[in-house]
Regions:
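Short amphipathic alpha-helical segments, especially helix-boundary/capping motifs
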Residues: 29-33, 49, 66-72, 97-99, ...
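Generic detector of short, locally flexible boundary/turn motifs and exposed helical patches
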Residues: 31-35, 73, 133-135, 181-184, ...
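Short helix-capping/linker segments at secondary-structure and domain boundaries
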Residues: 64, 130-134, 168-175, 278-288, ...
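A generic secondary-structure signal for well-formed alpha-helical elements
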Residues: 93, 100, 128-132, 171, ...
Length: 358
């Protein structure tokens, strides 16, 4: 699929009426439990940061209970081997901590370290039809971009596994990007069907109905105008140094029109760069484009490079410092797994009870 087709495929899944955006009022922060996560396939990039990472930190700082998942089993959906898994996992934790997630307040864990979470996959899979699994637009998109010769079974079932990620801790809010909305729909379907089929004796439902918490930032495209992705080589990593940042942005695609404007549908490449500078400067993209005016692509890129490097300097300094203590990163994961296991064990016991397994 071309990048343009990708955008269409993901955009066709509309937000559920109950989904929230980052600017919607949350009410009492302590009434929510938030879970979100990332695949440990490489460093997080600026799209992750503006799309979800900074919202997670905002939620944490508001006092919402946070679970942040390193989705290590999800890595083997579209590749045969989870390459350098431990290293990527630690680096993901590093990105989290550098961005401001605080392991004292947020539970950071890898789902392979939580057996009871994974066991929920079995009853959950029985609640979803094969036809539903094969219709998932995000899965279809990933299959189109996969380098594997054959599509494996996990590729079709991982959205149900993701439902287990969300439901094991009974999260009600899931901060995600637009492309994850089909998976949220799966989680809601699983929760609803499970509750209908297996209510508690007193009628109580086991699982809440999880809602997406969508970023208020417009989707940040990669340096080629397509979806920003570590695997597509069009992303600036959060922890990239200033020279690397400059090199990647200098190599970004632009167009022949010297006048810089913000027009995402007609000029995706130029608009992506304008948007990136605007997000870093906390200004409207129109104002940033206006200021560059007839300066052309060279002036635009200079502005973007400066804005990114300036905005991320403190985060990158913190990241470099944290990177010197790998033992601490592993300890964060151990502590997180301990908390997540206690919750997953309790949920699995409840699931087995309502199913009549004990
Ligand atoms: N699928 C998500 C991604 O690729 C990662 C993920 C796994 C996730 N489990 C999750 C996100 C649960 C939110 C909730 O980015």
């Amino acid at each position: 699929m071309t990048p343009a087709a990708t955008a269409t495929a993901t955009a066709t899944t509309a937000a559920d009426a109950s989904d929230l955006t980052a600017t919607d009022p949350l009410g009492d922060p302590s009434s929510h439990r938030v879970l979100t996560g990332d695949r440990p396939t490489g460093p997080l990039h600026l799209g992750h940061y503006f799309g979800t990472l900074r919202n997670r930190v905002r939620l944490q700082d508001q006092g919402v209970e946070m679970f942040v998942l390193v989705a290590d089993y999800q890595v083997i959906t579209d590749r045969d081997i989870a390459d350098r898994l431990a290293e990527h996992t630690e680096n993901l934790v590093l990105d989290y901590l550098a961005a401001g997630l605080d392991p004292e307040r947020a539970t950071i864990f890898a789902h392979s370290a939580v057996p009871a979470l994974n066991q929920l996959l079995l009853p959950f899979l029985s609640l979803v039809s094969v036809a539903e699994l094969s219709r998932n637009p995000t899965v279809k998109d990933e299959i189109a971009h996969s380098s594997q010769a054959a599509v494996n079974g996990l590729m079709f079932t991982y959205p149900v596994h993701q439902a287990a990620d969300i439901l094991f801790c009974k999260a009600d809010l899931v901060p995600v990007g637009q492309d994850q909305l089909p998976h949220l729909e799966v989680a809601r379907t699983v929760a609803r069907r499970f509750n209908e089929r297996y209510p508690h004796a007193d009628g109580r439902a086991v699982f809440p109905r999880p809602r997406a918490l969508l970023s208020d930032a417009p989707m940040l495209p990669g340096t080629d105008g397509g979806k920003m992705s570590k695997s597509r080589g069009n992303a600036v990593a959060l922890g990239a140094d200033e020279d690397t940042t400059a090199r990647i942005i200098r190599g970004a695609k632009t167009d022949a029109d010297r006048r810089i404007t913000y027009d995402p549908s007609a000029r995706p490449e130029v608009s992506g760069l304008v948007l990136l500078a605007a997000l870093c400067q906390e200004r409207d993209p129109e104002a940033v484009a206006e200021e560059i005016g007839d300066g052309g692509a060279a002036a635009l890129k200079r502005t973007v490079i400066e804005s990114v490097n300036e905005h991320f300097r403190p985060l990158r300094a913190r990241r470099a410092e944290l990177a010197t203590d790998r033992g601490h990163l592993r300890q964060v994961l151990r502590d997180g797994a301990e908390r997540a296991n206690a919750i997953a064990d309790a949920t699995l016991a409840e699931v087995r009870e309502v199913m009549g397994a004990i």
